[in-house]
Every structure is written in C-alpha cells, then in structure tokens.
C-alpha cells in the first residue's frame, strides 16, 4: 500500500494544478456591494437555502453581499463560501436606514457600456461606498415605469450583469473552466466581455423587461420577447425575478421549483445507496423505529428478508463505524472475520491478513481458511469481529504478549447490558433473553436458529477498563454501543478511560418487598409509566376490589406485554397494588404552620418520641405507604474496574540493565528431581504456627541484577494473609549428597529456573560449554568488585525451523544459532517505500521507489539473528564462508566504511543498503543475505528488502546495546519502533565478550575481555583541552561543529558507530551528556581499542560529579579517579621568598569594647526580646553564644513557636472565590499601575509579538540553571519533581538563618521569613515567564537613567553611580511595610498587562494567574500576595516597586533611580502626585520616604551599600557585626573571603574614607580590619584557603606587587602595620630598638600622619575619646617617644599634632 504525505502537492495532474493556482490569483478581482435592504432580506431565508440554492435562483444578492467589504478582508474573515450567520455577524451594520429616502437609481451610458448606478439622494446619509461601475440593478426601483432606452438596456444587458445568468452559465457549462476564466466573483465588465465573446454576432434583443408592483416593492422580470421562438440564446426560466424580496422569489420560483425537487431526489438517491450498503433488508415498522433510534436508516423499497434482519443491520453498521476508525492505507490483521465483509468496512482493496482460529464448531464451516491455536499478530493493528466474548482477559493479554508489534486491537462484541442484572430484554423487537443458572441465551428477533449461548460472567467485559499483569497494562475503551452490540478498542499501556460506562437503560422499576413471605413479593420489573398509572388508579377509588385491580392491569398491558409476565407474576402484581390501595395516604404528623411559640418547642420533642416508638412498635400507615413507593429504578450503568491477573509472586518487577538477565517468576512448581535424592537423617522438628502471613507488595520497583550485583529494595508495603503458616526447624547431620556433573540431566527445569541455572552455573551446562568452545573463549566469567560478568547472557527460548543442511547452517547450529520464520510487517514495508518516494533516499528516485513498492510482497522468510558486543567475533566465523562461496552470499551494510572493511577481508558481493535495493529491481539476492550492523538501517528498510527477496535466508548481525538509526526529519519511519525491538526476541542469547576493548574498559561496560592494557600506557585520562592526535566524539551536532574548528576528526556519539579507533577523546558536557540515551553513550565508549580521553567542559572541583547520574559514565568516573590516584605525584618547586615590604595604613587602633558597647547600647534581656505564645511558650531565637551573636536573632525550623508566629504574620488565607473577587475589584488599580509604569519605562512603544526563539532560550536557561545544582540538592527535591505533587501545592517552612540586619540588632524578635516551595514544573514555567520578561524589558526599556541591580556586580553599580549620580542636592530612599503581603490583586493585574505587552503566550500568563489564585498550603488557600518560592519573585518585586513609585511620585526624566526588589534610591527629591492622595487608601502597600543630605555620614544607602562620590561602599557597621558574629559562632573560615572582598572597596578609598564615613562608622571599619588581622595571625587550616596567598602567615608571604596582586598585598600591608602599632601602644619599646633605621611610612606622602592627627583632633576634642583609644599610660608614653623620633624637617605644628 502506498502512503502519501498529505502535505505533498499533486504530482501528475500538472494542468489541474496550474488552473488551481490561476483560480486563486483571480479571487482578488471580485468587488461587489450589498445594500442594507439586501442584508435585511437575507435574514428571511434559512441558512441552508442561502448556501445551496440562492446562487442558482437569485445569485445577485449573494454575490453583492461579498462586495460590501474589501475582497481580501472579506475572504479572510468569511472564507470562500460563508454561511448566513457568519455574514450577518461580520457585515451587517448596527443601524438600518430606509432605502427609498437615501438612494436613487440612475442609468448612464459610456462609450462602451451602459451602467445602472445607485446614487445617494440629496440629504441622505452615506451608508456605504458604492462603486459606480458595479451596482447593476436595484432591489427596489423608485420608478414606476422604465424609459425605452433604459428598458432596452435592462433587456439587453441586465440578465448578463446581475449574476443570475452568470451562475446559470456556469451550471450549463464546465464549472471549472468558467471559474478559471473569470474567477469565482468577476467584475461586471469582465463578465460582459465574456458573454460578448461567447455570443458574437448573436441577437441579444430576444428578451424584454416587465415591472411588477407589490407591497414589498417593485420587481424586474426578464421574459422572452416571443415565447414561441426557438432562437433563445440562453435557456432562461420564465418569470425569473432579478432582485427583489427573496421571500417573494421563493414563492414564485416557477420552473426552478422542479429543479429543487430534482436536487432533493438526487440527495435521496445518494442516501438510499449508502443505507443499502449495510441495511438492504426489509423490516417491520417497529424494527424500523428501533433502528432509527440508533441512527440506522432503512430502505423503503427493500424486499430482501432475513431471519434477524435488524440485528444484521446493527452488526453491519458497527462494521462501518469500525472501518472509519481504521487507517485506510495500513495493513490490518483480521481475526475471526469473513473476507466477504471487507466491503462493509471499506477495505475491499486492502491487503489485510485474515487469521481465523477455530473457537467453536460452526467456525469449521464459517471460514474458508482456518487454523487451530491462536497465532501471533505481525501488524500493529488488529480486529476481532464479534468474538471477544469467546476470549478471556488472560487470552487477550497473551495475544499482546505473543505479538510485540501489536499496539491497538479493535473488537466488536455482542453482550446485552441487561445480563448484568439478569433482566428481560429492553429491545424485544430486536432480541429476547433467557437465563439458565450461570448462562444466558441471546435470541435475535425470536429466531432460535440464530441464538447464542454465553456464560453470564462474559458480561464482565462491559465493566473492564484495564487488564493488568504485574506492571504491564492493557486499556479497554468502549467507543460505541448499538443495542447489544459494542465496539471496543484495546491498546497497550495504561491510559485514561471512562470510570463509568453508560448503557441504554429501560424505563422500568423494581417493586419493594412488602410481605414477609419472600415468594409472595414481585420479582419482575415493571414499566415505570405502568406502575405510576396503577398507583394513581388504586388510590383514586373509594372502594377497590381485587378484581378491579386485575381488570385495570389487563387494560393497561397490551397482548405483547402480557406475554412478558408469567401468571404468578401477574397475581403478585395485583396483590401489591391491592395492598397499596389499603394503605393510608394521609399524613398524621402535626403541622408546623400557624403553631405558637410553645408548640414550636414541643413539636420536635413529640416527633422525636414518635420516631422512637416507630422503631419498636412499627411505622405508621402513612410511612408504610411511603416506604412501599420507594421503587428502585433499573439502571445498567456500571463502574469500570481493573482486571488484575497478577499472581502474588508477580508483584516483583525485574529490571534489565546492560547485559544482565531479566525475567518474571514462573507459576509452576519446583523442578522435579529425576535422580533419587540422598537420604538424610533428621532429628525431631519443632514447629511454630503463625496466624497471619506478610506478603510483600512493591511500591516502586525492585532492581534485580543477576548475578552478584546489589539489589536496591525500595519502600514496600506488606499485606496480611489469613492463611496460617507453619515454620519447621530441625538440625540436619552432615551427610554429603551425591553431586551430579550435569545438572541439566538431573533436574527437569521449567520456566525461569532454567535461565537462572544457566546464568549462575554455566560450567555445568553442556550447551553453553559447547558454544564457548566453538567461539574459542573461556567458559569462566570475570569478577569485578562484587559483581560477576559472564561471557553469555540474556538467554531466551527460541524455536528454530528445520531447513536444509549445509556447511554454513551446521556452523550456525554448532554455535547455538538457527533460523526462525519471520514475516515482515506490511505496514513497515509501506512506510519505508513511502519515505523513499518522498525523497528520503539519496540514490533512489521516486519512480524507483514506486516500482519497489509494487514488487514488494511481505512473506515469511528464514532469519537468523546474532547479537553480541562489538568485537565479539560475530562476523569472523561468517567471513570464511563469504570468502569461499561468493555466489551464495550477499552482504549489505548501512555505511560505506563497513562495506570497505568487508571488501578488505575478501568479500565480493558487498553493497550499501540503497544500492542493494536498486539491484533488487533487476536481480534477486543470493541464497544467504548478511545484514551487518542492522540497528543502523532505517526503520522499515529491512522488511522492505526482505519483501523484495523472499527466497533468500537472512543472517541479521548487530549489537542490541548500540544506538538505533534515525531517519531524516519529516520521515514517516521515525514513528516506527526500532528494528532491534523486533529482532532481539529472535536471538537465543547475547555474546557478552569482546576482543577489541581492553579489560578495564570492557568490564566497566559489563563485558568480558581478555585483552590487557599495554604497560606504561594510560587507559583512561582527563583533559580540559580538545586533543588533536585522535578522534573526538561529541554529544551533539552543535558541539561537533565547534570541535571541528580545532580537530577535523570529529563525530557525534552515534555517527561513529561501526568504526573503531586506537585512541578516542569523548567530550563530556554537563547538560547534554547526562540527557543522552544509554545506547548513545555506550556507542561512544566502545569505539576505542586503546586509550580513552575524557574532555570535560565542567569546571571546578566537582568535575564529573553530575555526570555520574548517567549510566556507564558512573563506572568510568571511578576508573578515572583510581587511575589518577595511582599516578606518581609530581612535586611542585618551592617558591622563592623575599623580604616583607613595609606596611602602610591610615587607621588608628580602636577598642573592641567601645564598638560592642556602641552596638549593644539599646539591647534588652533575652526573654524581653522573645515572643511569647500561651500555647507554646517563648520562642527560641536568642542564642547566648557571644556578646554580639546573642543580639542577632536566630531563626530555625525547629522553633515551633516562631514558625506559627511567622505563618500568622506573613501568610494570609482566603478562598479561591475571594481571590477571584480580589482580582476583579483591583483590576482598575492594576490598570493605573500599568499606565504609569508604561509611560515611565516604555514611552511611545506599542505591544510586541512573542519572540519564540527568546522564549525557548529562556526555558533552556532556566533548565540549565536548575541542573547546575549539586546532585544532593537535585535528589533532595524529588518530592516536588513528582507529577503527583499538585502544581498549586506549596511546601512551606521557616527559613533557617541568622538575621544580621542592623535594624533588628538587639531589638525584640519579630516574625521570621517563610520559604515556599512549589512543584518544580511550576517553578520552571513561571521562571521562564520571568526570564523572558527580564530580557524583553532590558531590550525595550526607553529610560536610560534606571538601574536594576540584578546580574550586576558592586563594581557595575559603582560605575553607574560615578557616571551620572547627582550629589549636589538631597537624595530619596524609601522603606515599605509588608512588601510581599501587600502585593494584592492590583499588582497581579499589572503583571498580567505587562506580560501581554511583552508578548508572553496567553497560556503562560493564565497559568501564572492561576498560581496566584489557587496556591495553597496545609492550612488552606493563600490569598493573593507575593511568595518567596515563585519563579519571578525578584523581577516582579522590582517591577512592582517601580510601578508603585511611578504611580505615587513624579519622577523627572533626568533623575537617576536604582531599584532592587523593595529597595529604591534616587538622586533627587520626589514630589507626590496630587491624584495619588485619592488612591492611597485603596492600596495595601504602604511606603515611607526618607531624604538624605548626601554629605558625610548622610549618604543614600541601597541594598546594604552607601552611595558616595567615590563609588559605592559597604556599610561598616553591618560588616563588623556580621564578621564578629561569624567569629563567635566559628564559621568565619567560610565567610572571611567574602567579607574581605567587601572591605577592599573601603580600603581602596584611602584618606577619602573620612569624607564618606562619620566618626563611628570609621571606627567600625577599623574594627573590621582588626577582626581580619587577628584571624590571619591565628593561621588558617581551612581547605578552601590553601591556594590563597592572603591566608598564609605574614613571614611566608611572597611579596610581588604585580597588577593582579595589588589588592591582596594591600590588605597584608595594613595587617602588618596594625601589628606594629598594637605593639607600640602596649609599650613594647623593643619594636623600635630592633629596627633603629625604620620609620613608619604612612599612606600618601610623609606628612600623612600629620593629616590623620589633625583630622582626629577636629573630630575628637573630648578627653573621653582619647582615653578610649589610648587607654594605657604606657601607651601614651610610647607614642610620645615615637613622635620624638620624627625627622627634624617637620615643623612644630606637626610635632604638636603628632603628640596628640
């Protein structure tokens, strides 16, 4: 069967194709117009008439209608054939005006033609643009008579201009040619020229025009001038109306009425022909009505009879429905189906395969060909015709197990739904039912000869939704039900299906049991209407006798209905209603209406007491009546169930990895011993009884690796079994049993035991030993660690066919291989041929592909499959026969490289697969065809080649673990399953050894190898650069192209398959390699015969850590590390040491006591700071560790009290409805925020379209960021990665942290910060949204003076400040209260508008809004607010801050503004907008403004940084308390480097620091230096500091002041000087005596000390400050002696100030 791409153009009919394109080009010429009156009148007719008939009757109105808009616009909006409703919606204006008062008709003549113009009357309104040369004729003519010349014009020209004649002309001539010539809607001039051309020299004056006045207007009639004349040019109908009211046109159709009837008859004929296809039988009127209720028509003229015609019609109709669901060009396997029914399914010309197995005796005469035993299905789709009820779910599951290609099974079944409840037939005119114990009889239309007998349990098919065995599922879906006939489709896998199946239920009820004698109650069902009528009747008579009930029953039941009941049923029915008549219908309960207060209190007590009495004494008469009338309505609807066939031992799943064996446990008994067991004496045994047994039920799976590999057992549950278990235990004396040499002879082995014995004990199996001996390999495996690798694995039971014996066949059999019968899948053949026809082949043309498909004939061929590792010698023993008998062998390879390899070894007939296909057209293949490396052939190609050469025998050779082939983009073959899935089950075992790879590499891949590496040569190595001396394998085509710029010998992982190299370099990418398939990675690792070099693009000490998640590479990483550990260590040369330079500083010694007192001056006691809760007591946030640390709050998850306080304070709750109402109420505020934001940052821009490339890039960026996390973090988030984790659920917890904010230091504890964790997919989606909007904002923002502190460094911010910040006036900063909780519905609306402006896809926006509305925690749904765990938290916080500030303040265009989350800074004073005062109360967000004078100690701060003229610097106070707390806690090792980097900007200011910081801040800066200095003096053993020169001891520092080391040397110089000054102030005079020639060199020039002394003198005039700095008298004396040693060149002022 040939498949064609539906998008491919028609190839053969070139003429039709050109005409079609010409027709499309002419469509744009149409320009017609329609008046408002025309539009009004169009509404008077039905849509069906307008679409089908109007163009043949009065096409003027229809054609004019399309003219009211521009042709291109109308075509795009309406389409080529618009419906009436669509035209009215698109084109009818909202207001209508009178035609008479606004328009007039004017007829004019031109040089060529005469035109009728519709002009606007004086003073009339202009309704539409009416072209002068197009509006021919008018619906309402204002003239009572037409002048002669005008009449002549109307007679001669109008019939050909108004569209009617044009359409008639097209009907009478070739429709296609007329359309091509004129286009679908021609201009009037074009049509006139066409008419003149076709009727040259013809008399056009054979018609005349008559006018008729009616209440609806004036009409123009075209009639023949001489009715008896035979010279009519055009066969125009008499009294044809041109224009006018369409309702009148319909009434006066004239001869066209017959035309409509003829068209109706044509439609009826077509419908009858369709009905006759599946229902050619005659039926009674009741049967016809029943069939019509199921949508099955009947032929009124049918005379053919059938014993059960109606049932046969339903069966045929269901086959017609099935045929519509089957793919026409696919080959289907028909099971239990007659060939003569193929036309009912529309498959008469299809090459379907019919397989009919004998299920019952009548099948012997039903089918022309049949078989015994259910065969396998070779196609992907199969159909079972009305035989599913003969099969059990087990047999259906086995059919799928035996048929690996089978994916979809269509099946019809005949099971009446009434059998679920054993009710009588609901369709007695179609079938009747009888029940016998556990069986029922289905009698179609009362014909006993066509009856069926089934078991009642077969009705379970109606309720089965899935069939399960272990972890495998089949899904059963009901597609259609017609009476008792059902259409099911069964597919592989577990997919969603209906939880309830609804069947047509009768309007019947079952009566309640009212008598104690069960046999006296009514057991049959009654018609619901009949029961209601009887109940009303018996209660309507005052006196009722039993005879009256019997008479009424006979009156209401027809003769046919009476036959459905037995006499006993009728008697029981009469008694039921007679009993019902004598029950009371009066409610004796006390009424509530009108009762007083006292009665309303007492009445419930009375009612309660009466209910208690009824429980003991019986119900009242009224309640008896109500209970008797509680009839049960019969309903056949069923809840679907999963049919589980799993045995207890099948609960264990076996997973196959690498070369390891996988199997299911067998249900058979233990193997029977064929040799008598050795007798052993046993002592008396004691037994213990258990009442319950625990049976393990797997939760995820159990990964079994056989043999000798660890078995990771996942979480499991245990079910209790009530069967008692007796465990016996007794000692056994040492008695040595006899040991059989061959276990296969001593035991009868069934099921999986044979496989396990072959795996565990291969040395005891003669067959395995023989195979290994023939291949010349050792019978022993290799032990790697705790694992045993065997030379042969993956045993399967394969039944070989007996064929003729020759030397080659015997050689295969000696090695354990043989030929099996394989039938190529016809669908794969068709797909391969279709791909070749559409240009997927390089050497094969489309004509050759078509010829190949015609010649292909899928038939069974003999096939031998050999699977093994690369280098196992699969082709070695074949090469000898190929070389000795070249005429008997044909070798086909997927690559030219393999072809050359075969030719080098002496093979003659070797071809690539495309060449082999072309040769098959001229010459068949030889007796044996070898398909080498078959996994690289395109999918379906092997089946196509086998179908062309059916007489050859095939040897299929390959490796099941290497990569599969993938066809070009757009090929149909990409949808097919790989060939390895079809041929792997035909191989008896897997050759698990290799002679190519060295033993360490082979063992790492799970193979046995006896090739030892060469001594002194590395096997595995790691490099950061791409080598040039070997082949490089890259994980993607992009990386391959990049590698080719360095090394032209580059391949992808899979493109190198089939080739081997002495040395291979494998490029490892952190993000790409880990997502490569196992087969691709295995292919790359198995290409080398020697060394493998891993080239890593992952930087850092954790190289390869994340790649360990990839199979195979995990083992190789360990090998690489072992190899590196075994290499000799190369000792690095010691560095030369130089003398220390004299250090420089500008900071004095500061007392630590003073700094701590300054920090703690406002602190309070611990329990005065803690929060107290009555239920949980105090919080535990104050940790008494050190004097600074105890003032810093410690928030941790274990603090339950603080956790609840945080949830109460930070998280607010609401319902989803309240959140929706919040969004609706705040929508206007959101628009205001967006308007101000857009004006400030998108001035003059319009919304943009989505940038798909950027969106994909952002998604990839988010994914890469997520995968860059450590493996521990990735595994820690498994719960949120699960699809079972609700996308709106939030896992919330308290963030564990030290709160080192200066504003919270030493103050009472406040609520902590929550961390909210969404489902990972939700974070990825919203993160993509945020990243896309971030990139688009950076691209489109029109404000050059705004700075967003994201993806920027402190140096970037400092550069921005220096380039434009204005320090001449005051600056503005702000502080927001509850910033996250205040972002309500107004900000969500702002975010939605912002996203729409940037072109974000609608579904992504809707998903984000849903997360804001529906997110919930364990407490309930969260109200609309900002949450910390959202993907766009930072960006949306920043934009919310920007929008609010732009709404509240007037921000000048020249103002420099900086934003980061809720932080804000501006270099100008901002004024509040007057309009904001009215809006302020409607915003939850409250913001306070602060002004900074931008002088010393009063600069604007932003994100913990101070904005100064010299750039930005860190706040020294915050730095000191953070450093000191780290020092006290003991975590300074990890933090010292970061704080050192923060101090560098302060250090680099030099003396300028005094102009930026006040006195207190300067002292805190000196305190930071002191902490760093003391840490370095103690020395650092932290592993992260080993390579940093900063943390070496001062005397071992290598002082080379180079460009890159200047910053490091600076801090060392400061530290050394601090040490010298400290010794000096403590009175250690030896420091100066030991260095008599050394003077302190201060920063800058020699009078730097003078500057410092003068500056300190101005700031510290009080003696208290000097006492704190120089707190020892010895220190003062030492300082005076030091100043005395200054140079004599300094003046007295310097000396005096130095003394100070």
From Swiss-Prot:
Pfam families with a match to the protein in the record: RdRP_2 (PF00978), Viral_helicase1 (PF01443), Vmethyltransf (PF01660)
Signal peptide positions (record): none
Keywords: ATP-binding, Helicase, Hydrolase, Multifunctional enzyme, Nucleotide-binding, Nucleotidyltransferase, RNA-directed RNA polymerase, Transferase, Viral RNA replication
Enzyme Commission (EC) number: 2.7.7.48, 3.6.4.13
(+)RNA virus helicase C-terminal domain residues: 992-1128
(+)RNA virus helicase ATP-binding domain boundaries: 842-991
Alphavirus-like MT domain segment(s): 299-462
GO MF term (any one): RNA helicase activity
Disulfide cross-links: none
Residues that, per the record, bind ATP: 868-875
Entry's Gene Ontology BP terms: DNA-templated transcription; mRNA modification; RNA processing
Catalytic reaction(s) noted: RNA(n) + a ribonucleoside 5'-triphosphate = RNA(n+1) + diphosphate; ATP + H2O = ADP + phosphate + H(+)
Domain RdRp catalytic: from-to ranges: 1369-1480
InterPro entries in the cross-refs: (+)RNA_virus_helicase_core_dom (IPR027351), Alphavirus-like_MT_dom (IPR002588), DNA/RNA_pol_sf (IPR043502), P-loop_NTPase (IPR027417), RNA-dep_RNA_pol_alsuvir (IPR001788)
Coiled coil residues, start to end: none
Misc remark: The sclerotinia sclerotiorum debilitation-associated virus contains only a single ORF.
Role, per record: RNA replication. The protein possibly functions as an ATP-binding helicase.
Family statement: Belongs to the potexvirus/carlavirus RNA replication protein family.
Protein name per UniProt: RNA replication protein
Species for this entry: Sclerotinia sclerotiorum debilitation-associated virus (isolate Sclerotinia/China/Xie/-) (SsDRV)
């Amino acid at each position: 069967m040939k498949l064609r791409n539906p998008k491919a153009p028609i190839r053969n009919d070139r003429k039709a194709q050109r005409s079609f394109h010409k027709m499309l080009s002419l469509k744009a010429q149409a320009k017609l117009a329609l008046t408002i009156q025309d539009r009004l009148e169009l509404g008077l007719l039905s849509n069906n008439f307008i679409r089908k008939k109007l163009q043949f009757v009065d096409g003027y109105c229809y054609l004019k209608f399309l003219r009211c808009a521009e042709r291109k616009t109308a075509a795009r909006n309406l389409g080529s054939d618009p419906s009436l409703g669509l035209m009215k919606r698109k084109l009818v204006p909202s207001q209508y005006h009178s035609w008479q008062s606004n328009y007039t008709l004017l007829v004019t003549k031109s040089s060529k033609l005469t035109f009728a113009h519709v002009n606007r009357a004086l003073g009339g309104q202009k309704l539409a643009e009416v072209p002068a040369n197009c509006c021919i004729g008018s619906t309402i003519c204002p003239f009572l008579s037409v002048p002669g010349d005008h009449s002549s014009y109307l007679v001669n020209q109008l019939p050909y201009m108004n569209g009617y004649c044009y359409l008639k002309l097209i009907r009478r001539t070739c429709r296609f040619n007329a359309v091509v010539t004129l286009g679908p809607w021609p201009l009037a001039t074009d049509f006139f020229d066409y008419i003149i051309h076709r009727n040259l020299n013809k008399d056009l004056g054979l018609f005349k025009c008559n006018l008729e006045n009616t209440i609806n207007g004036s009409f123009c009639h075209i009639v023949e001038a001489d009715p008896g004349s035979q010279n009519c040019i055009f066969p125009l109908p008499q009294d044809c109306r041109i224009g006018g009211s369409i309702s009148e046109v319909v009434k006066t159709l004239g001869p066209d009425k017959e035309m409509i009837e003829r068209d109706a008859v044509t439609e009826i004929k077509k419908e009858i022909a369709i009905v006759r296809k599946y229902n050619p039988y005659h039926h009674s009127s009741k049967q016809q009505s029943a069939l019509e209720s199921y949508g099955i028509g009947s032929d009124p003229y049918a005379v053919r009879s059938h014993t059960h015609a109606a049932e046969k019609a339903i069966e045929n109709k269901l086959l017609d429905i099935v045929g519509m669901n089957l793919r026409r060009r696919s080959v289907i396997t028909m099971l239990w189906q007659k060939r003569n029914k193929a036309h009912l399914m529309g498959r008469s010309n299809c090459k379907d395969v019919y397989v009919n197995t004998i299920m019952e005796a009548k099948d012997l005469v039903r089918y022309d060909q049949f078989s015994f035993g259910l065969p396998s299905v070779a196609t992907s789709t199969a159909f079972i015709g009305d035989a599913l009820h003969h099969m059990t779910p087990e047999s259906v599951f086995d059919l799928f197990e035996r048929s690996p290609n089978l994916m979809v099974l269509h099946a019809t079944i005949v099971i009446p739904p009434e059998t679920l409840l054993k009710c009588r037939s609901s369709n007695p005119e179609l079938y009747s039912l009888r029940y016998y114990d556990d069986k029922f009889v289905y009698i179609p239309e009362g014909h006993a000869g066509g009856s069926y007998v089934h078991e009642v349990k077969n009705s379970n098919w109606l309720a089965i939704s899935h069939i399960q065995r272990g972890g495998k599922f089949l899904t059963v879906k009901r597609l259609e039900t017609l009476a008792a006939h059902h259409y099911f489709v069964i597919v592989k896998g577990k997919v969603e299906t209906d939880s309830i199946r609804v069947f047509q239920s009768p309007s019947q009820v079952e009566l309640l049991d009212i008598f104690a004698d069960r046999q006296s109650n009514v057991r049959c069902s009654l018609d619901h209407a009949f029961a209601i009528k009887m109940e009303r009747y018996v209660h309507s008579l005052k006196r009722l006798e039993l005879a009256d009930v019997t008479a009424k029953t006979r009156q209401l039941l027809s003769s046919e209905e009476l036959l459905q009941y037995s006499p006993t049923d009728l008697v029981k029915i009469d008694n039921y209603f007679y009993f019902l008549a004598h029950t009371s219908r009066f409610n004796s309960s006390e009424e509530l209406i009108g009762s007083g207060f006292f009665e309303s209190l007492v009445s419930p007590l009375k009612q309660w007491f009466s209910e208690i009495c009824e429980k003991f004494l019986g119900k009242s008469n009224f309640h008896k009546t109500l209970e008797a009338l509680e009839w049960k309505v019969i309903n056949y609807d069923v809840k679907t169930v999963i049919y589980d066939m799993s045995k207890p031992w099948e609960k264990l799943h076996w997973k196959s990895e690498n070369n390891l064996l996988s199997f299911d446990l067998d249900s058979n008994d233990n193997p029977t011993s064929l040799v008598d067991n050795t007798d052993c004496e046993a002592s008396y045994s004691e037994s213990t009884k258990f009442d319950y047994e625990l049976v393990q039920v797997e939760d995820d799976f159990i990964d079994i690796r056989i043999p000798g590999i660890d078995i990771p057992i996942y979480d499991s549950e245990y079910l209790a079994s009530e069967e008692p278990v007796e465990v016996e235990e007794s000692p056994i004396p040492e008695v040595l049993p006899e040991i059989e040499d061959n276990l296969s002879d001593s035991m009868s082995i069934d099921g999986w035991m044979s496989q396990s014995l072959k795996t565990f004990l291969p040395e005891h199996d003669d067959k395995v030993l023989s195979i290994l001996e023939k291949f010349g390999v050792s019978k022993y495996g290799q032990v790697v660690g705790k694992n045993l690798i065997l030379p042969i694995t993956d045993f399967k039971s394969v039944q070989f066919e007996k064929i003729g014996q020759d030397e080659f066949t015997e050689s295969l059999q000696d090695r354990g291989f043989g030929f099996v019968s394989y039938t190529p899948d016809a669908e794969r053949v068709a797909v391969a041929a279709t791909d070749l026809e559409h240009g997927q082949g390089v050497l094969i043309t489309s004509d050759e592909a078509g010829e190949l498909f015609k010649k292909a004939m899928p038939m069974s061929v003999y096939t031998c499959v050999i699977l093994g590792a690369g280098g196992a010698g699969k082709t070695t023993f074949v090469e000898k026969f190929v070389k000795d008998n070249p005429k008997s062998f044909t070798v086909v390879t997927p690559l030219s490289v393999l072809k050359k390899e075969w030719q080098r070894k002496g093979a003659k007939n070797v071809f690539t697969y495309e060449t082999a296909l072309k040769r098959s057209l001229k010459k068949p293949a030889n007796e044996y065809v070898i398909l080498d490396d078959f996994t690289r052939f395109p999918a379906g190609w092997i089946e196509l080649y086998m179908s062309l050469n059916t007489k050859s025998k095939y040897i299929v050779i390959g490796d099941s673990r290497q990569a599969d082939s993938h066809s070009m983009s757009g090929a149909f073959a990409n949808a097919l399953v790989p060939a390895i899935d079809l041929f792997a089950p035909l191989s008896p075992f897997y050759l698990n050894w290799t002679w190519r790879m060295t033993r360490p590499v082979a063992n790492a891949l799970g193979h046995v190898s006896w090739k030892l590496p060469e001594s002194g040569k590395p096997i595995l190595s790691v490099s950061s650069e791409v080598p040039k001396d070997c082949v490089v394998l890259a994980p993607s085509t992009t990386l391959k192209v990049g590698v080719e710029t360095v090394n032209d010998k580059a391949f992808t992982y899979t493109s190198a398959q089939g080739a081997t190299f002495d040395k291979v370099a494998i490029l490892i990418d952190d993000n790409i390699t880990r997502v490569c398939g196992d087969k691709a990675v295995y292919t790359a690792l198995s290409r080398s015969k020697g060394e493998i070099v891993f080239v890593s693009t992952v930087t850092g000490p954790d190289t390869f850590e994340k790649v360990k998640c990839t199979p195979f590479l995990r083992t190789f990483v360990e090998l690489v590390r072992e190899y590196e550990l075994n290499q000799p260590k190369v000792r690095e040369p010691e560095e030369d040491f130089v003398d220390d330079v004299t250090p420089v500083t500008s900071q004095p010694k500061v007392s630590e006591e003073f700094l701590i007192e300054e920090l703690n001056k406002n602190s309070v006691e611990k329990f005065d700071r803690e929060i107290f809760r009555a239920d949980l007591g105090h919080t535990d946030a104050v940790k008494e560790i050190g004097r600074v640390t105890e003032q810093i709050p410690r928030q941790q998850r274990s603090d339950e009290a603080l956790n609840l306080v945080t949830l109460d304070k930070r998280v607010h709750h609401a319902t989803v409805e309240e959140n929706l109402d919040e969004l609706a109420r705040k929508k206007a505020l959101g628009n205001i925020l967006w308007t101000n934001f857009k004006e400030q940052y998108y001035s003059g821009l319009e919304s943009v379209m989505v940038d798909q490339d950027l969106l994909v890039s952002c998604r990839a960026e988010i994914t890469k960021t997520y995968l860059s996390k450590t493996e521990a973090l990735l595994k820690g988030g498994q719960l949120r990665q699960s699809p079972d984790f609700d996308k709106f659920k939030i896992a919330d917890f308290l963030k564990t942290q030290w709160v080192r904010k200066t504003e919270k230091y030493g103050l009472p504890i406040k609520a902590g910060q929550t961390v909210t964790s969404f489902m990972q997919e939700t974070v990825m989606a919203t993160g993509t949204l945020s990243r896309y909007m971030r990139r688009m904002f950076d691209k489109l923002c029109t404000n050059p003076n705004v700075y967003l502190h994201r993806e920027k460094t402190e140096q970037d911010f400092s550069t921005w400040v220096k380039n434009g910040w204005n320090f001449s006036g005051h600056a503005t900063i702000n502080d927001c209260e509850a910033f996250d909780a205040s972002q309500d519905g107004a900000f969500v609306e702002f975010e939605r508008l912002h996203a729409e402006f940037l072109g974000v896809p609608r579904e992504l926006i809707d998903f984000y809004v849903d997360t804001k509305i529906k997110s919930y925690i364990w407490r309930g749904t969260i109200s609309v607010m900002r949450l910390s765990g959202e993907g766009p938290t930072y960006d949306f916080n920043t934009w919310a801050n920007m929008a609010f500030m732009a709404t509240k303040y007037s921000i000048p265009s020249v103002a420099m503004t900086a934003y980061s989350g809720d932080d804000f800074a501006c270099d100008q004073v901002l004024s509040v907008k007057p309009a904001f005062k009215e809006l302020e109360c409607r915003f939850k967000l409250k913001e306070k403004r602060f002004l900074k004078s931008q002088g010393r100690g009063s600069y604007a701060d932003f994100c913990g940084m101070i904005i100064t003229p010299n750039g930005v610097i860190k706040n020294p106070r915050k730095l000191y308390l953070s450093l000191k707390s780290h020092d006290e806690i003991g975590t300074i090792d990890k933090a010292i480097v970061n704080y050192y980097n923060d101090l560098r900007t302060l250090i680099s200011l030099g003396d300028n620091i005094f102009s930026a910081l006040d006195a207190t801040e300067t002292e805190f800066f000196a305190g930071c230096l002191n902490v760093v200095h003391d840490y370095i003096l103690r020395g650092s053993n932290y592993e992260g500091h080993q390579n940093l020169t900063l943390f070496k001891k001062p005397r071992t520092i290598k002082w080379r002041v180079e460009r890159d080391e200047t910053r490091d040397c600076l801090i060392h110089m400061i530290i050394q000087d601090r040490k010298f000054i400290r010794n000096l102030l403590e009175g250690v005079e030896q420091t100066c005596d030991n260095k008599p020639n050394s003077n302190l060199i201060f920063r800058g020039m020699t009078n730097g000390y003078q500057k410092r002394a003068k500056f300190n003198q101005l700031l510290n005039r009080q003696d208290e400050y000097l006492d704190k700095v120089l707190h020892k008298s010895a220190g003062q004396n030492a300082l005076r002696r030091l100043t005395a040693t200054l140079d004599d060149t300094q003046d007295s002022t310097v000396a005096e100030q130095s003394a100070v």
